[in-house]
């Protein structure tokens, strides 16, 4: 048992229980955290060292922009946990150290997901991949991407090309796995290795395929922990043992996360739920007089600074889907325990306070687990920081706690999972709007004219009949669900085989829950289109080949986003219906089906891939992001828009329901105190309506227009998009225009 070793002084002053005999971080937190219900008066400003380091980061960021988005990159060394020497911003000033290569801002080369992707990322920025490295990963070491395309069917390839399924993680790391990085700080690496060895030695001796695979995975996990210790040694730390103070706890935890991002470039490399855990160490050191509040904030600021400069080399195609260089270093803050105690600590404030000390930023993806039972002072502080920075997203803890307990985190944007006990197979999105066009055209693509879906006679009537359209739409969704799940099964089989997340999984229990995280795009377009067909008169317009390529609408129809049950119920039905169809298909590793209504910035790409739709949206125009109403159609004010989105049922969308909400400051009130109060009331109301997620932007449209014209004046302008935050000036002009075209609510 761990308590018999020589490191018990690391836990001096902590309340003990099961956690000091077996891995149980949740119990450690519940026994030892200190609820804070006070205000923000205790917070400290940035130290001189913090300001100096942040100036250095801003200078490097400026140089990166001037170099076309890439400061430097490795073109020869495949990144692993131990591949590069230690790197620093300023070793004498940094309180938390460690970067992905030997230099900050130098991006690593990660070929295990796909050598073609790695090569394309190099060439996109004027670099050349080392020929010997390319040869190794082409001729001798197969990659995830190669494996997937070896197994894809022609039907899957056609769907991918047409964009009825797109954004699939078949050419990039899947991500969305959260290692329990807290375990390294609490237990030290040696104990974690002992536990993995114990699990390996007590496994079934009946060598089925599942057992053999798990034995190999455990061996890889064990080796990754050895590498993690070596990484610690490179920076002068012995992380084989538990952390003994707050500074070590932050450093140990960060090194574990650093190891993960050195080894994987997943689309979302989320951090978990660390602030309350780390606060336990801070409170102990403060009580003992070993540290000051200013020193605690400085360490947090330096930790946040490191999370802000996480970088991966991406291809232009990837950047179209996930624009603005996001990494989704998502940190989940707050929430309420299953015993009813809020889990807000002083560290909850300190993490958000970094937005003052360092200025606004998109990373880490600061996510407040909102509950109506959070302390009022914390609610007000969150509202104040949202209005000031537009850098925070909110997710309904009262909704998620029922399914995930009180030690879950958010992966990527809106996907809840129990930390260290659950992972997901990320599945991008199926295009429900395009599927509706396939139903009308008998499986033919409205843009290319090719037969992509199942072949049957297209609709021939001069006016679309709702019942006829829906009957065919249902069949098309049946087909789409099948090809979608089967594509994901191939992708995740190959990812486990060729690009396994061994370190992240080493920081999980050996027996875990897996989910198959599907998603849908174009929900509001599909719902409004069906509403138009049902309540107005929609005439299809055909080209010379008889393909429906446009629509003429006579009359008005209910539009999603106005709290009108006639169309909102269509949206709800689509979500429930498609989820039922997905569940009818077997998943890889018996993972549980989940679904998201989330698009990231790929709503622009989906729009490009989709022709004219029966709701009046023109070919190529962006979809609304996530579960949002289409731009400008939610005309009855903020609360009606929120009410429509809140109707989407979380029970069949447990991978998350993203809602991005923009409001002008004056609509929240004239005075700051009124604005803060009104925003907290709005969040409480949305939570009570069972709304899941809310990105909040508070600014005027004119600010964004000026930033487009004068980007140099807005280096830290941060906005929330579908599920994450981004530096506005890093978006493409097309995506900037899409953001500006969205609804800015001027009334509640």
From Swiss-Prot:
PANTHER family noted in UniProt: FORMATE ACETYLTRANSFERASE, FORMATE ACETYLTRANSFERASE 1
GO cellular component: cytosol
Entry similarity comment: Belongs to the glycyl radical enzyme (GRE) family. PFL subfamily.
Gene Ontology molecular-function annotations: formate C-acetyltransferase activity
UniProt entry tagged with the keyword Cytoplasm: yes
Quaternary state and interactors: Homodimer.
Glycine radical modified-residue sites: 723
Residue span, Glycine radical domain: 625-748
EC annotation from Swiss-Prot or TrEMBL: 2.3.1.54
Role: Catalyzes the conversion of pyruvate to formate and acetyl-CoA.
Record keywords: Acyltransferase, Carbohydrate metabolism, Cytoplasm, Glucose metabolism, Organic radical, Transferase
One GO term of the biological process aspect: glucose metabolic process
Alphabetized PROSITE patterns for the sequence: GLY_RADICAL_1, GLY_RADICAL_2, PFL
Top enzyme category: transferase
Positions of the PFL domain: 5-618
CDD domains to which the protein is assigned, alphabetical: PFL1
Misc: Several mechanisms have been proposed based on complexes formed with substrate analogs. After activation by the glycine radical, the cysteine radical, Cys-413, can abstract hydrogen atoms from the other active site cysteine, Cys-412, and from coenzyme A, and it can also transfer hydrogen atoms to product radicals. The other active site cysteine can attack the central carbonyl of pyruvate and covalently bind the product acetyl group.
Name of the protein in question: Formate acetyltransferase
Pathway(s) the chain acts in: Fermentation; pyruvate fermentation; formate from pyruvate: step 1/1
Compartments it resides in: Cytoplasm
Catalytically driven reaction(s): formate + acetyl-CoA = pyruvate + CoA
Pfam families assigned: Gly_radical, PFL-like
Active site: 412 (s-acetylcysteine intermediate), 413 (cysteine radical intermediate)
């Amino acid at each position: 048992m761990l308590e018999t070793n020589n490191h018990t002084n690391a836990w001096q002053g902590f309340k003990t229980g099961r956690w000091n005999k077996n891995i149980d971080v949740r119990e450690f937190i519940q026994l030892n955290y200190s609820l804070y219900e006070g205000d923000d008066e205790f917070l400290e400003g940035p130290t001189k060292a913090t300001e100096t380091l942040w100036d250095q980061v801003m200078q490097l960021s400026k140089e990166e922009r001037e170099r076309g988005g890439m400061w430097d990159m490795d073109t020869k060394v495949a990144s692993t946990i131990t591949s590069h020497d230690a790197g620093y911003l300023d070793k004498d000033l940094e309180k938390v150290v460690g970067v992905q290569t030997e230099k900050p801002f130098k991006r690593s080369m990660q070929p295990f997901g796909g050598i073609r992707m790695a090569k394309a990322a190099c060439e996109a920025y004027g670099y050349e991949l080392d020929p010997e490295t390319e040869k190794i990963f082409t001729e001798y070491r197969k990659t995830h991407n190669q494996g997937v395309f070896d197994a894809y069917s022609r039907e899957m390839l056609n769907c991918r090309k047409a964009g009825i399924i797109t954004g699939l993680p078949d050419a990039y790391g899947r991500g969305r796995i959260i290692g329990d990085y807290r375990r390294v700080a609490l237990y030290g690496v040696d104990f974690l290795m002992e536990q993995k060895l114990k699990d390996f030695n007590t496994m079934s001796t009946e060598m089925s395929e599942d057992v053999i695979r798990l034995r190999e995975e455990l061996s890889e996990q064990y080796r990754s922990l050895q590498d993690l210790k070596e990484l610690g040694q490179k920076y002068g730390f012995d992380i084989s043992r538990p952390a003994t103070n707050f500074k070590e706890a932050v450093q140990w935890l960060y090194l574990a996360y650093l190891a993960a991002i050195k080894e994987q470039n997943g689309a979302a490399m989320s951090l978990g739920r660390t602030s309350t855990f780390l606060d336990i160490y801070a409170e102990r050191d403060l009580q003992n007089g070993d540290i000051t509040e200013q020193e605690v904030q400085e360490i947090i600021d330096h930790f946040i600074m490191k999370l802000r400069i996480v970088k991966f080399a991406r291809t232009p195609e990837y950047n179209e889907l996930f624009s603005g260089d996001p990494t989704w270093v998502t940190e989940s803050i707050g929430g309420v325990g299953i015993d009813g105690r809020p889990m807000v600590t002083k560290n909850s404030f300190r993490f958000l306070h970094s937005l003052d000390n360092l200025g606004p930023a998109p990373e880490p993806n600061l996510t407040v687990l909102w509950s109506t039972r959070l302390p009022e002072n914390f609610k007000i502080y969150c509202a104040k920081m949202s209005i000031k920075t537009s850098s925070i997203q909110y997710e309904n803890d009262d909704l998620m706690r029922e399914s995930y307990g009180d030690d879950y985190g958010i992966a990527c944007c809106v996907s809840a999972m129990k930390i260290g006990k659950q992972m997901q197979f990320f599945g991008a999105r199926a295009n429900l709007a395009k599927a509706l066009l396939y139903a009308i055209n008998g499986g033919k693509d409205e843009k290319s004219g090719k037969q992509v879906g199942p072949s049957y006679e297209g609709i021939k009537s001069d006016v679309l009949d709702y019942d006829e359209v829906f009957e065919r739409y249902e069949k098309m969704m049946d087909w789409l669900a099948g090809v979608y799940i089967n594509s994901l099964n191939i992708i995740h089989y190959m990812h486990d085989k060729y690009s396994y997340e061994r370190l992240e999984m080493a920081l999980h229990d050996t027996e875990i829950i897996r989910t198959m995280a599907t998603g849908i795009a174009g929900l509001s377009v599909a719902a409004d289109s069906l509403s138009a067909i049902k309540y107005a008169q929609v005439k299809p317009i055909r080209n010379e080949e008889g393909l429906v390529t446009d629509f003429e609408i006579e009359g008005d129809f209910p539009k999603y986003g106005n709290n009108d049950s006639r169309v909102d119920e269509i949206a709800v039905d689509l979500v429930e219906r498609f989820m039922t169809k997905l569940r009818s298909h077997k998943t890889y590793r018996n993972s549980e089906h989940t679904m998201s209504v989330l698009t990231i910035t790929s709503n622009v790409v989906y729009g490009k891939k989709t022709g004219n739709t029966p709701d009046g949206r023109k070919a190529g125009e962006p979809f609304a992001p996530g579960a949002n109403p289409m731009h400008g159609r939610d005309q009855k004010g903020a609360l009606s828009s929120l009410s429509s989105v809140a109707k989407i049922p979380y029970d069949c969308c447990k991978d998350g329901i993203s809602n991005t909400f923009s409001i002008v400051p004056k609509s929240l009130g004239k005075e700051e105190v009124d604005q803060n109060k009104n925003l907290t009331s709005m969040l409480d109301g949305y939570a009570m309506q069972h709304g899941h997620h809310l990105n909040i932007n508070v600014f005027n449209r004119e600010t964004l227009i000026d930033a487009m014209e004068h980007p140099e004046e807005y280096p830290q302008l941060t906005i929330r998009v579908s599920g994450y935050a981004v530096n506005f000036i890093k978006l493409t002009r097309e995506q900037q225009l899409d953001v500006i075209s969205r609804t800015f609510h001027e009334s509640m």
